[in-house]
């Protein structure tokens, strides 16, 4: 016999506003990509990573992150990059998405022993 459903479904965690710091290894994702496509592909990789990690289709990349990806030119984006992913509420009423993800650059001196961590969000 089938079980009766007595449990109430939990709210989806994707609807919560949250901020995380992550390291993205661009080197393994840019392997075998032509020189003139590396920096543009790095931007697309960051966008795809944020979309998967935070579960939102609307991803906005900060200008400082864009400059960090492009600062060595089109051929040589950094091997790794530390980013802060902030899932935020969309103020635009006619937008199809209720939430969006803002991706900002976090400068670090070394990537050793860094892990993904939740950050107490401070609204700007």
Curated annotation (Swiss-Prot):
Signal peptide: none annotated. It holds the Pfam family Ribosomal_L31e. GO terms for biological process: cytoplasmic translation. It comes from the Eukaryota. GO terms for cellular component: cytosolic large ribosomal subunit. InterPro entries: Ribosomal_eL31 (IPR000054), Ribosomal_eL31_CS (IPR020052), Ribosomal_eL31_dom_sf (IPR023621). The keyword RNA-binding does not apply. Transmembrane segments: none annotated. One of its GO terms (molecular function) is structural constituent of ribosome. Keywords: Ribonucleoprotein, Ribosomal protein. Belongs to the eukaryotic ribosomal protein eL31 family. This is Large ribosomal subunit protein eL31. It comes from Aedes aegypti. The lineage of its organism: Eukaryota, Metazoa, Ecdysozoa, Arthropoda, Hexapoda.
């Amino acid at each position: 016999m089938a079980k009766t459903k007595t449990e109430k479904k939990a709210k989806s965690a994707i609807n919560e506003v949250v901020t995380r710091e992550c390291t993205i290894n661009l080197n393994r994702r840019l392997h075998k990509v032509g020189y003139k496509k590396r920096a543009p592909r790095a931007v697309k990789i960051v966008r795809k990573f944020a979309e998967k990690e935070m579960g939102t289709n609307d991803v906005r990349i900060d200008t400082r992150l864009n400059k960090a990806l492009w600062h060595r030119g089109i051929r040589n984006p950094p091997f790794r990059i530390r980013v802060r992913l902030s899932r935020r509420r969309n103020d635009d009423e006619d937008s199809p998405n209720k939430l969006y993800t803002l991706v900002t650059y976090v400068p670090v001196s070394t990537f050793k022993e860094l892990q993904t961590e939740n950050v107490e969000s401070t609204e700007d």
